[in-house]
Amino acid sequence: METFLFTSESVNEGHPDKLCDQISDAVLDACLEQDPDSKVACETCTKTNMVMVFGEITTKATVDYEKIVRDTCRSIGFISDDVGLDADKCKVLVNIEQQSPDIAQGVHGHFTKRPEDIGAGDQGHMFGYATDETPELMPLSHVLATKIGAKLTEVRKNGTCRWLRPNGKTQVTGEYYNDNGAMVPVRVHTVLISTQHDETVTNDEIARDLKEHVIKPIIPEKYLDDKTIFHLNPSGRFVIGGPHGDAGLTGRKIIIDTYGGWGAHGGGAFSGKDPTKVDRSGAYIVRQAAKSVVANGMARRALVQVSYAIGVPEPLSVFVDTYGTGLIPDKEILKIVKESFDFRPGMMTINLDLKRGGNGRFLKTAAYGHFGRDDPDFTWEVVKPLKWDKPQA
């Protein structure tokens, strides 16, 4: 059996770039909660002792941006300079303006357009992907890297590993074989964890705790063997972390947010963007389409692309590739997808209920992935029943 190696990485919520994603989406939640028609394009950047939120926001909501920044930093665990940032003492800069009236007129007709006539907020192309290798219909390498990162945060916050600090990165290399286009995981080849820690812990203790409390509960035994390689804090020391260690910026972890390098990516980030931004809503609808194709048994693996022009409601193109795993031709699957999903931005917003913010809805998406999550707020993960005729054996 000929196999190959494929690697996916993740970062947890204390990584500076992810901190910025979470602040941007916390701002989005706050705006949408009070005004579902808010137009939000909120960026965040951070470095030692400083967080800045900036961008274009048009909303009737009353939003305390500084409070959102401090609350988000605090909830992640940035409560002192020792861990990389002090939520209560850091400088918070705000530079937010209104959305350009040119964009507002072209896209929304200043709110005079019907939902089906609302144009895309920008040009671009987005991809959705699904694969039958996990129950989530997501790539195993990505799922494991993401869940290990989430587990790191869990054992830090519940006190299991008191030496942990907020910043951390994970990476999983899977060994696969190609079953006529479908991806079949054979084993986990390598697990890499680099996590921020305090001064009190030794490298041996770090390795022991990570294996026992983080890796063991997450990676199924069937994927581990005596040849699996573990790199646990291979650099030896990671005390300085968070914004003190590295600058952070919204939208720099787009592969971690999606499919871990599998499928494809159009390049647009998600966090801090309201649903008129097709970078986000378009990527959500094509994930639902790809997932529905696989979940309905039409293919074992699927990639769906959609593209847009600014101000134009109808997509310019829709594309489907099942990598040779389709039970019917891709052109027939494409026809079913186009008949079953409404790719117009205004309709995607309604069908996926994307104007509903608050309760940390979009904040949740900003760490540990936007896809493959079992959460009713992730409406794009709901499988749509598709009508198709299975070929006779």
From Swiss-Prot:
ATP binds at H15, N167, G168, K169, S235, G236, R237, F238, D246, R252, K253, A269, K273, K277. This is S-adenosylmethionine synthase 3. Coiled coil: none annotated. It comes from Brassica juncea. Its cofactor is Mn(2+); Mg(2+); Co(2+); K(+). GO terms for molecular function: ATP binding; metal ion binding; methionine adenosyltransferase activity. One of its GO terms (biological process) is one-carbon metabolic process. GO terms for cellular component: cytoplasm. K(+) binds at E43. It is found in: Cytoplasm. Its main location: cytoplasm. Catalyzes the formation of S-adenosylmethionine from methionine and ATP. The reaction comprises two steps that are both catalyzed by the same enzyme: formation of S-adenosylmethionine (AdoMet) and triphosphate, and subsequent hydrolysis of the triphosphate. Its EC number is 2.5.1.6.
